[in-house]
């Protein structure tokens, strides 16, 4: 059995621990309220999640939008379902288009792949929802049309995005209509996005992939010499997938299979079990050392092998075999930091949400533009910002994640889920934030499942992030003696203010208690909110 929760708190927190029969947790209060409204209208957890996701495209455009990708894990009361709603590259893409470049550009049309978030909303609504999409979209439409106050973190990220993307086609007209980024506390309106959301809801997504909006996206691409076409949009499809699972701490952790990085969490947890991690508290020097080394090994495998699963050299499950994980664990020196070869991950922006209802349905959902506002391309008169997920490809033709047409790139965004030892749902969770996501999932699992920390304490705890080589960035809230001890072991520790660049992710957790009600927790490093009823 997983360890019972400890409801004492050991860390400073800006957020209370919430408990109730229904729950929504995400990075923006207005979006959380949109989800809770659906539950109050008689909808279920999936209805709440879709409404929350659509609202997030409006109130947190610095991390996601209508032109994002999305992934989800759903517990329907009987079994788990995995959804991959990420898009593929334009069919006409090939490596020669990027000749002379060392990487796919991060901004502009050359980074744009087919957006999948809209298809994710529709697929979830059709399979699990109870309320019409027009109802689910209404809070988002109202926020976009009537305006919403820009929250503190979003105001900062908006300014940073404006500085980088203001000259990209359509960006300033949509997101800086007054010639500057909106300031914290100002009301921002996006009537074009309201119209697009309304059209998407009324047509059940068809307008985006085969109708008026698809035509506008393709025409704008053609006008700029880009490769995304109406056919690329029309050919998009979602995939319902079998989850990857790893037993851990008397329960199991569930992740979506590649093209995402969730498998790195499972690899690291499997390695740690071989190292006797249960003997070491996650704040102890030895616990931190082993966790860092296990994650470095997992990231090495992630960088070398993981891509669109249709293009991987072998099945992803091969990386999770006990024999393989034992061989990887044997490489860890329990007293000194080691060098493992892997690429330097890229920073990004994402939104995550979780919802649960009194019937027992739970959903873990994530969507993202990838890096902040994404490519910077905004389709005129639509409010649709397009993601830059294409820069997740590599240009090495021998790599399984090599750029090609009609192919999904490697993804950083991952929803997480955990089950107890009796096959019942334990928690839906996620830690948005690029390469922090798999690392954050592992840290949440260690703290909550293995050591029984309550979800808010686990979220508030100091975080660390492997970068490359022996470099590890830790939050400035880390104990100074612990930092010194890690340095003595050979770790190259960089101390960073958690609010400096927001690179330690944003966590949301909904934990199911044995009696069937929920404990909900939200990220104190973000503007988020957990709501219960």
Tell me what each language-model feature is:
Residues 240, 347-350, 411-413:
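Short, small/polar residue-rich loop motifs at catalytic or cofactor-binding pockets
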Residues 64-75, 351-356, 415-417, 506-512, ...:
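Short beta-strand scaffold segments in enzyme catalytic cores
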Residues 254-262, 350-354, 366-377, 430-437:
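Glycine-rich phosphate/pyrophosphate-binding beta-alpha loops
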Residues 58-75, 79-81, 227-229, 361-427, ...:
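Active-site rim segments in enzyme catalytic domains, especially the processed small/beta chain
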Residues 2, 274-369, 382, 389, ...:
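Internal maturation/activation junctions in enzymes
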Residues 1-33, 37, 45-210, 214-260, ...:
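Noncatalytic scaffold domains of N-terminal-nucleophile
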Residues 359, 407, 441, 450-501:
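Extended C-terminal subregions enriched in glycine
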């Amino acid at each position: 059995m997983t360890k019972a929760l400890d409801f004492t708190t050991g860390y400073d927190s800006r957020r209370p621990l919430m408990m109730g029969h229904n729950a929504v947790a995400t990075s923006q209060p207005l979006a959380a309220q949109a989800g809770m409204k659906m539950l109050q209208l008689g909808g279920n957890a999936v209805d709440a999640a879709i409404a929350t996701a659509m609202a997030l495209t409006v109130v947190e455009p610095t991390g996601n939008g209508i032109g994002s990708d999305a992934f989800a894990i759903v517990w329907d009361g009987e079994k788990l379902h995995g959804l991959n709603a990420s898009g593929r590259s334009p069919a006409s893409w090939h490596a020669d288009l990027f000749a002379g470049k060392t990487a796919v550009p991060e901004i502009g049309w050359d980074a744009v792949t087919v957006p999948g978030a809209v298809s994710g909303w529709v697929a979830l609504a059709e399979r699990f929802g109870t309320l019409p999409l027009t109802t689910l979209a209404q809070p988002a439409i109202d926020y976009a049309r009537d305006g919403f106050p820009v929250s503190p973190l979003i105001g900062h990220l908006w300014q940073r995005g404006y500085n980088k993307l203001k000259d990209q086609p359509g960006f300033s007209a949509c997101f800086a209509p007054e010639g500057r980024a909106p300031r914290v506390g100002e009301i921002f309106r996006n009537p074009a996005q309201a119209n697009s959301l309304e059209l998407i809801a009324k047509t059940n997504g068809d307008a985006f992939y085969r109708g008026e909006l698809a035509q506008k996206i393709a025409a704008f691409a053609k006008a700029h010499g880009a490769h995304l076409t109406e056919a690329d949009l029309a050919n998009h499809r979602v995939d319902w997938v079998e989850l990857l699972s790893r037993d851990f701490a008397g329960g199991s952790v569930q992740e979506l299979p590649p093209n995402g990085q969730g498998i790195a969490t499972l690899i690291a947890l499997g390695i740690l079990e071989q190292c006797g991690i249960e003997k070491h508290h996650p704040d102890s020097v030895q616990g931190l050392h082993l966790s860092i080394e296990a994650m470095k090994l997992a990231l090495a495998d992630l960088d070398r092998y993981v891509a669109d699963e249709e293009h991987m050299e072998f099945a992803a499950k091969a990386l999770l075999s006990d024999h393989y994980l034992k061989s990887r664990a044997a490489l860890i020196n329990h007293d000194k930091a080691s060098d493992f070869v892997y690429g330097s991950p890229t920073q990004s922006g994402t939104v995550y949400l979780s919802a649960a209802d009194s019937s027992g349905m739970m959903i873990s959902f994530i969507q993202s533009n990838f890096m902040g506002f994404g490519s910077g391309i905004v389709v005129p008169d639509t409010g649709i910002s397009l993601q830059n997920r294409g820069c997740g490809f590599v240009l090495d033709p021998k790599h399984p994640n090599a750029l090609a047409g009609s192919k999904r790139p490697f993804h950083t965004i991952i929803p997480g889920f955990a089950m107890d030892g009796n096959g019942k749902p334990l928690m839906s969770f996620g830690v948005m934030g690029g390469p922090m996501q798999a690392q954050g999932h592992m840290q949440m699992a260690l703290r909550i499942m293995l050591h029984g920390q309550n979800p808010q304490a686990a979220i508030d705890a100091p975080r660390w992030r492997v970068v490359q080589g022996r470099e590890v960035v830790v939050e400035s809230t880390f104990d100074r003696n612990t930092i010194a001890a890690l340095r003595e072991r050979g770790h190259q520790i960089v101390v960073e203010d958690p609010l400096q660049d927001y690179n330690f992710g944003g966590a949301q957790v909904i934990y199911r208690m044995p009696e069937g009600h929920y404990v909900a927790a939200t990220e104190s490093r973000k503007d988020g909110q957990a709501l219960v009823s």
